[in-house]
Curated annotation (Swiss-Prot):
Site (Transition state stabilizer): 476
PROSITE patterns: ZINC_PROTEASE
Protein family membership: Belongs to the peptidase M1 family.
Function of the protein: Broad specificity aminopeptidase which plays a role in the final digestion of peptides generated from hydrolysis of proteins by gastric and pancreatic proteases. Also involved in the processing of various peptides including peptide hormones, such as angiotensin III and IV, neuropeptides, and chemokines. May also be involved the cleavage of peptides bound to major histocompatibility complex class II molecules of antigen presenting cells. May have a role in angiogenesis and promote cholesterol crystallization.
Protein name: Aminopeptidase N
Organism phylogeny: Eukaryota, Metazoa, Chordata, Craniata, Vertebrata
Positions of modified residues (Sulfotyrosine): 175, 418
Glycan-modified residues: 38, 84, 126, 233, 338, 626, 682, 740
Origin species: Felis catus (Cat)
Catalytic activity reported: Release of an N-terminal amino acid, Xaa-|-Yaa- from a peptide, amide or arylamide. Xaa is preferably Ala, but may be most amino acids including Pro (slow action). When a terminal hydrophobic residue is followed by a prolyl residue, the two may be released as an intact Xaa-Pro dipeptide
A Pfam family of this chain: Peptidase_M1
Enzyme Commission no: 3.4.11.2
Length: 967
């Protein structure tokens, strides 16, 4: 699944400051072009009830662990072999106003250990009685006696259908369970659900799926665990005018449905052996564009007919073939299927989902329009496609054994998405962006005492809610970061060879992370060049089995190098033990005054010494070249001063990525009280002559924390003046490069730098920027059919107009939002609507999030996050969340990956005793309701608030003085 959109999957690929000066208030709205990894698993809840009163009952039990149906993991007694599933979705409501689907399922399974209980997952399905029971059971091959059912029951808490038998099943024999059922085709974005959209003023309804991680059971009864692989024969009964899609191609043309000639039946080819969470089927009237890869694989891009007719699927079609071919070569394994369908859905909770052969996307992650999509939108499309196609091998062909190793699936895809996208767009330098989008992004979370290791014991991940929590930035971005580090010190060639060996060995099977280490070790052992200080397993286990990461400290006077577990709050208490005592085996690259040095390994000890890190009076050293290692670097004060001098005299001597590193690391070290905050601020002085994107983005991301802490205090005035001074040369640079904004930069990085220049200049009151934005918006408002604003600058211009305007400007943008046909444009407009500095307008906007006809369910949490990023809106959203917590939790709390992002967003300004007390009271008040997938985020918010409170008390005066002196 794609990184959340992360909206998260903020989280993001491109963070753009959208804040703009208003008459009394400067509002900066962060808009994140990101691959949000929203999730859609749900946990069930049930009260205890009495024992069953009849042969077939629906019962919710207490968790008496001696009963196998009260254990969340399936017993190993039965293993599925195949499913024959027929489903019929009704896309008009019944006489009760409900949308439903009906279905039948025949699951064949093998008995591995004799048992008199059949346990299979089932969620919110109503069964048609078979001789008084919910299912029928028979032996395969006609052996006797046939199984006799005593009773069947549904266990709501563990989401099981339980079949109690008179006699045990026989080990080694196959059985078939037959069921007929009905479920609701709800609009909850989970399992088999419905999506709605408007086409030419007419409401259209489609049926689609999202199974990961525990929602296949909501569509039909199944053994819903990733290691319970089987083959699937899917048949869909659907209206004549609609098309049905699934993981495989149809066996042949659709045939009339005998009971009703207005319906037809589409039967699909048998799937390879696969996991339930990768199943997909869709019924819609969508159109497509198609091509064939050189290998012969059929490639189709599906979307609303109007989107296809306008060419919005063409870019995805263009890059899919090259990316598939790249991964076939990269993995040394052919694409396993004969077709690759990708479909853009109007309602989709995740950024995308890697269903085998039928990948589902948010529209913003698949559709691109040259006229109205920004460079960030285009980058998102190619990287999300690469992420999902990477999964077709790593995740689908070879699958994790259990969700505790989710990082192996998602971390790998989050790393190689940059490789696949770079192959499709080789001039964009996309691989460099991983440092900003993943490494630095996840360090902010991994530096908390409440973080968690990449891999945890399987016994700690059981319930659907626990599984949902694993879908976080640690699994995605830290997983990607440490795999990138591993690939770097092994070399990419050895890494690829190990991956290919791993895939060849375990194809159609399941693995744990140790299997990957074994195959990488095998390729290391077969060559003489790369020498490691220990085995791959010994090195990497320290990075995945203990949380956090080290800060490497260098004393250039003595050449001493040391490591320490880095914590943003040095007073926080780490309660999670580590078998490695929070020491890592660290690969260290370095340069001396611009010249590369030999590679060095810091073994799993606290301190070592090497002359590589010892300097003379005129030398400086810089560690972690291009940030290939997952760690921070600190230096003695003298070396820091030399680096600062180098940056202010000739910054080109230090690579671009490391110019970003110097800024990022220093601000984090200052937060942890390892360097003075003035040192970190001094590292931004060179920006007055910097035009590259990455250093500026690192600075803006770091200084955004200062803004959050101080935009309600007297510090903000001098801070605004300083940033205005620093960004003005960058704004003037792009004014010249673009010939007074009549042209646009050629390279992607320069385009991103231009976006930062304009958004930051407008945010901090550069008059020329404000005039530019106002002029462009006025031209558009005068002629709405002809938008003169370049897509790259629209978010900034829209936000500026809303912040400086009133109800008229807000209503105009709202009208354009309602009319927007391309979701990328709608997202820009929706984000800008949060920029208002008028409380009543923001409260009205908040109320719209409760109406799915105004704000789609998939967009609610991101809309709330956008409003909370506005200094005026933050308190409003916090009050809104507290007042509406039960409804928000009911709608999004049990599965949505973005739900945890909402908690993070609404609390990120918290830095006072009162706000800490409010947060603690909020936790206390809602213990009965619960926090679902935001449980860990709430604990992290409490930890961050305490750290913020302490940091502001200690640094406010010195920061005020520094900005005053340097502005």
């Amino acid at each position: 699944m794609a990184k959340g959109f992360y909206i998260s999957k903020p989280v993001g690929i491109l963070a753009i400051l959208l804040g703009v000066a208003a008459v009394c208030t400067i509002i900066a709205l962060s808009v994140v072009y990101s691959q949000e990894k929203n999730r859609s698993t749900e946990s069930s809840t049930a009260a205890s009830t009495a024992a069953p009163t009849g042969p077939t009952t629906t019962v919710a039990t207490t968790l008496d662990q001696s009963k196998p149906w009260n254990v969340y993991r399936l017993p190993k007694t039965l293993i599925p072999d195949s499913y024959n599933v027929t489903l019929r979705p009704y896309l008009t409501p019944n006489n009760k106003g409900l949308y439903v689907f009906t279905g039948t399922n025949i699951v064949r399974f093998t008995c591995k250990e004799s048992t008199n209980i059949v346990i299979i997952h089932s969620k919110r399905l109503n069964y048609t009685s078979h001789q008084g029971h919910m299912v029928a059971l028979s032996g395969v091959g006609g052996f006797h006696p046939q199984p006799v059912i005593v009773r069947t029951e549904l266990v709501e808490l563990t989401e099981y259908l339980v079949v109690h038998l008179q006699e045990p099943l026989v080990a080694g024999r196959q059985y078939e369970m037959n069921s007929e059922f009905q479920g609701e085709l709800a609009d909850d974005l989970a399992g088999f659900y419905r999506s709605e959209y408007m086409e030419n003023g007419v409401k259209k309804v489609l049926a689609t799926t999202h199974m990961q991680a525990t929602e296949a059971r909501k569509s039909f009864p199944c053994f819903d665990e990733p290691a319970m692989k089987a083959t699937f024969n899917i048949t869909i009964i659907h209206p004549n005018n609609l098309v049905a899609l699934s993981n495989m191609l149809p066996r042949g043309p659709s045939v009339p449905f005998g009971e009703d000639p207005t319906w037809k039946v589409t039967e699909f080819e048998t799937t390879p052996i696969m996991s339930t969470y990768l199943l997909a089927y869709i019924v819609s009237e969508f159109s497509y564009v198609e091509t064939r890869a050189p290998s012969g694989v059929l490639i189709r891009i599906w979307a609303r007919p109007s989107a296809i007719n306008q060419g919005h699927g063409d870019y995805a079609l263009k890059v899919t073939g090259p990316i598939l071919d790249f991964f076939s070569q990269h993995y040394d394994t052919p694409y396993p299927l004969n077709k690759s369908d990708q479909i853009a859905l109007p309602d989709f909770n995740a950024g995308a989902m890697e269903n085998w052969g039928l990948v589902t996307y948010r529209e913003s992650a698949l559709l691109y329009d040259r006229q109205s999509s920004s460079s960030g939108n285009q980058e998102r499309v190619v990287t999300v496609i690469a992420h999902e196609l990477a999964h077709q091998w790593f995740g689908n062909l070879v699958t994790l054994e259990w969700w505790n190793d989710l990082w192996l699936n998602e971390g790998f895809a989050s790393y190689v998405e940059y490789l696949g996208a770079d192959f499709a767009e080789p001039t964009w330098n996309l691989k460099d962006l991983m440092v900003l989008n993943d490494v630095y992004r996840v360090m902010a979370v991994d530096a908390l005492a409440s973080s968690h290791p990449l891999s945890t014991p399987a016994s700690e991940i059981n319930t659907p809610a626990q599984i949902s929590e694993v879908f976080d930035s640690i699994s995605y971005s830290k997983g990607a970061s440490v795999l990138r580090m591993l690939s770097n010190f092994l070399t990419e060639d050895l890494f690829k060879m190990g991956i290919a060996s791993y895939l060849h060995t375990y194809k159609y099977g399941n693995t744990i992370y140790l299997n990957l280490w074994e195959h990488l070790q095998q390729v290391v052992d077969k060559q003489p060049t790369i020498k490691l200080p220990d085995t791959v397993s010994a090195i990497m286990d320290r990075w995945i089995l203990q949380m956090g990461f080290p800060v490497i400290t260098v004393d250039t006077q003595t050449g001493t190098i040391s490591q320490q577990h880095f914590l943003l709050d040095p007073q926080s208490v780490v309660t999670r033990p580590s078998q490695f005592n929070y020491l890592w085996i660290v690969p260290i690259s370095s340069v001396r005054s611009g010249s590369p040095q030999a590679h060095y390994w810091l073994p799993g000890v606290e301190k070592a010494q090497n002359d590589l890190f010892k300097t003379t009076a005129n030398d400086w050293v810089l560690l972690n070249l291009n940030v290939t290692g997952y760690y921070l670097v600190n230096y003695d004060n003298e070396n820091w001063k030399k680096i600062q001098t180098q940056l202010q005299t000739d910054l080109s001597v230090i690579p671009v990525i490391n110019r970003a590193q110097v800024i990022h690391d220093a601000f984090n070290l200052a937060s942890a009280q390892k360097v003075p905050v003035t040192l970190a601020l001094n590292n931004t002085l060179f920006l007055i002559q910097e035009t590259e994107y990455m250093p500026w983005q690192a600075a803006l991301s770091s200084l955004s924390y200062f803004k959050l802490m101080f935009d309600r205090s007297e510090v903000y005035g001098p801070m605004k003046r300083y940033l205005k001074k620093q960004v003005t040369p960058l704004f003037n640079h792009f004014e010249r490069v673009t010939k007074n904004w009549t042209d646009h930069p050629q390279t992607l990085m320069d385009q991103y730098s231009e976006i930062n220049a304009v958004s930051t200049a407008c945010s901090y009151g550069v008059p020329e920027c404000e005039k530019l934005a106002a002029t462009l918006f006025a031209q558009w408002k005068k002629n709405p059919q002809n938008n003169p604003i370049h897509p790259n600058l629209r978010s900034t211009v829209y936000c500026n107009a809303i912040a400086q305007g009133g109800e008229e400007e807000w209503n105009f943008v709202w009208e354009q939002f309602l009319k927007a046909e391309l979701v990328n444009e709608a997202d820009k407009l929706r984000g800008a609507l949060a920029c208002s500095n008028q409380v009543w307008i923001l409260n009205r906007f908040l109320s719209y999030t409760l109406d799915p006809n105004l704000i789609r369910k998939q967009d609610v949490t991101s809309t709330l996050s956008s409003i909370s990023s506005n200094v005026v809106g933050q308190t409003l959203v916090w009050d809104f969340v507290q007042s509406n917590w039960k409804k928000l939790f009911q709608d999004y709390g049990t599965g949505s990956f973005s739900f945890s992002n909402l908690i993070q967003a609404v609390t990120r300004r918290f830095s006072t005793e009162f706000e800490l007390q409010q947060l603690e009271q909020f936790k206390k008040n809602n213990m009965d309701t619960g926090f679902g997938s935001a449980t860990r985020a709430l604990e992290q918010a409490l930890e961050k608030t305490k750290a913020n409170l302490k940091w502001v008390k200690e640094n406010k005066d010195v920061v005020l003085r520094w900005f005053t002196e340097n502005s």
